[in-house]
């Protein structure tokens, strides 16, 4: 099931503000590409090409770890640069902001920051129970930054939020979308 509510710009009281800040991350060209996959010496159940990353999005890890990296981790947080290979456009030729729904549904990576992959253990997958996305603005350039933060993981469920940023907007970083997700965390046997 899907529920959508649409609105348009309108005048309102108060001074506009965004009460969160974009993370400070390296530029996309300095970040590892998801398309390249894990190094050959890493025991990872899937090898490139990964169809989604090879055919739809160029994703690059800007904050956090690659899923196959077994190193100890810190906060349940990650950020990734994303660029569509063929940017979706609406009928008028403008970037279709509904495409942001695709990148908003990548929050499980923030949970994996606190539960790293171990080749001798089961892997996990996390289908959505609830995904709510608030679209705010259309990105101005080809690269957008997703910043994901997990809030809790317990009893087979997890909750996270995603902030989608345009760091190259004319007047500084601009929040393009904000999303929340509750996911079912399940074990997948190898």
Specify the residue positions occupied by each region the protein language model found.
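Terminal targeting signals and extreme-terminal segments of soluble enzymes
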Residues: 1-190
């Amino acid at each position: 099931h899907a529920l959508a509510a649409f609105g348009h710009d309108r005048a309102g009281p108060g001074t506009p503000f965004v009460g969160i800040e974009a993370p400070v991350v390296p530029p996309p060209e300095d970040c590892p590409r998801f398309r390249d996959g894990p190094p050959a010496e890493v025991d990872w159940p899937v090898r490139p090409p990964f169809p989604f990353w090879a055919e739809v999005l160029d994703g690059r890890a800007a904050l956090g770890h690659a899923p196959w990296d077994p190193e100890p981790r810190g906060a349940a947080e990650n950020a990734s640069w994303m660029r569509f290979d063929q940017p979706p456009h609406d009928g008028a030729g403008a970037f279709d902001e509904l495409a942001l729904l695709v990148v908003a549904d990548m929050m499980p990576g923030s949970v994996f920051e606190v539960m790293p992959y171990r080749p001798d253990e089961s892997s996990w997958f996390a289908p959505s129970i609830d995904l709510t996305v608030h679209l705010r603005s259309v990105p101005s350039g080809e690269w957008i930054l997703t910043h994901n933060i997990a809030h809790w993981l317990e009893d087979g469920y997890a909750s996270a939020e995603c902030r989608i940023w345009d760091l190259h907007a004319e007047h500084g970083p601009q929040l393009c979308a904000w999303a929340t997700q509750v996911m079912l965390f399940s074990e997948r046997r190898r």
